Amino acid sequence: VTAFGSNGIGKTTFAKILAGVEKPTDGEIIEKVDIAYKPQYIESDYEGTAQDYLFENAPSYGSNIFNSEVGRPLALDNLLDKKVKKLSGGELQRLALAVTLSQDADIYLFDEPTAFLDVEQRLIAARVIRKIIESRNAASLIVDHDIVFIDYISDRAMVFSGEPGLNGKASKPADLRTSMNQFLGDLDITFRRDKETKRPRVNKYDSYLDREQKEQGEYY
């Protein structure tokens, strides 16, 4: 399940509450499942190397399964000898993804897993996350803004709406097409499928395709 919407609308707060990082102002979360959580902002003040960090924080690091399903796809070998403090934003993101995916959990929460990653790295991350979630028969909630990433990884989606910084509410999970039509309709933006790659691409505003899709109520 992916969650998307405007900035400052409550998506990160929602993820933090589910992860137990923050307490809800009303009600309570009944913890009956194991949750692995990758926060939006990644701390980089660790003194050691990336390999030291993995040894300390990634339970399955070093196993054949970890190396084949996580390490190689995320190109972790290129990071191992580097100091965590010296890692770039994209390198920190890959390290954080690896640590989260190394855990045995019922639910995996990812807050903006594509931040600082280039286009190809984002698609690789999507493949890695989806493969592992499916192979473990687990569930995931992913907060992100990248339409291509969301399109690849989502089975269902939640749309957050409201007034940024003041209040927000989430729709119940629905199929991706329904959720995207709701979200993009509010933004007055349409997407089409690229004929070759099948990836979503934004239509030029007020173009023929843009107008045609809006007349049909098909924003996505």
Task: Name what the model sees in each region.
Residues 2-6, 12-63, 146-180:
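ABC ATPase nucleotide-binding domain signature region
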Residues 39-89, 193:
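ABC-family P-loop ATPase nucleotide-binding domains
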Residues 97, 125:
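Hydrophobic anchor residue at the start of the ABC signature
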Residues 106-109:
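Walker B motif beta-strand of ABC-family P-loop ATPases
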Residues 112-113, 120:
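Walker B catalytic motif
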Residues 128-142:
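Conserved catalytic loops of ABC-family nucleotide-binding domains
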Residues 169-220:
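ABC ATPase nucleotide-binding domains
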